[in-house]
Amino acid sequence: MTVSAQNLVWIDMEMTGLDPEQNVVLEIATIVTDKDLNVLAEGPVIAIHQSDEELAKMDDWNVNTHTNSGLVARVKASQHDEAQAVAETLDFIRQWVPERTSPLCGNSIGQDRRFMVKHMSDLEAFFHYRNVDVSTIKELVRRWQPALLDQFKKSGTHQALDDIRESIAELQFYRSHVFKI
C-alpha cells in the first residue's frame, strides 16, 4: 500500500432521505483508486445504527428500497454509530491518501458531501474541496452525445459499495468513449 496524493477516494452513502437537516446516514462505503481508476482497495462497508424513530421518517421509496436491499435490517442490527463509522473510514483512507489531497469522488457526490458537512464533519474536512462527480459528466453526455447513454447500464442496487463500483466503471466508460484518454 502506497500513500499518494494522486490516489482518488470514492465514497457512497445511503440515507433515509435527501435532506441532511431532516434525514440521517444509513450506510457508508469507500473505495480507493489510483489516478487511472484502478481499484487499490475497498474500505469498510458500515451500516450505521439508527433509531426506529429515524427510520420511520423515510418515505415509501426509501422504505421499499432499503428494506428490499436488506439495509434496514443491517442498520437495526448494527453496533456502529456515526462517530465510529467516521473513525473507521478515516483510518482506512489515511492508509492511501494524505489529508486534503483527494477530491471526493462518486455519483451525485455533492449530496453525500452535504450529509458529511451536517453529520460527519471530520470526514468531510479530510477531503480536498473539489469533487469528481460522475453524474456531471453523465448530464453533459445526455445533452451532447445522448446515444452513448444506452451503452452503459447500471444495476442501481442502492447498496453503497455496489454503487461505488458502478460509478468507477461509469467513469472508465466515459474516459474511453467521451474523453478518449
UniProtKB/Swiss-Prot annotation:
What's any one GO cellular component for it? cytoplasm
The active site of this protein is located at Y129
User: Might you name a Gene Ontology BP term for this protein?
Assistant: DNA metabolic process
Keyword field: Cytoplasm, Exonuclease, Hydrolase, Nuclease
Q: What is its EC number?
A: 3.1.15.-
- What's the superkingdom here? Bacteria
The protein's location, in the record's own words, is:
Cytoplasm
- Gene Ontology molecular function, alphabetical: 3'-5'-RNA exonuclease activity; nucleic acid binding
Domain called Exonuclease: residue spans: 8-171
Question: Nuclease among the record's keywords?
Answer: yes
**Function recorded in the entry:** 3'-to-5' exoribonuclease specific for small oligoribonucleotides.
The record's listing under PANTHER family reads: OLIGORIBONUCLEASE, MITOCHONDRIAL
Q: Which family does it belong to?
A: Belongs to the oligoribonuclease family.
Q: Please identify the protein, giving its name as recorded.
A: Oligoribonuclease
Q: Which organism is it from?
A: Aeromonas hydrophila subsp. hydrophila (strain ATCC 7966 / DSM 30187 / BCRC 13018 / CCUG 14551 / JCM 1027 / KCTC 2358 / NCIMB 9240 / NCTC 8049)
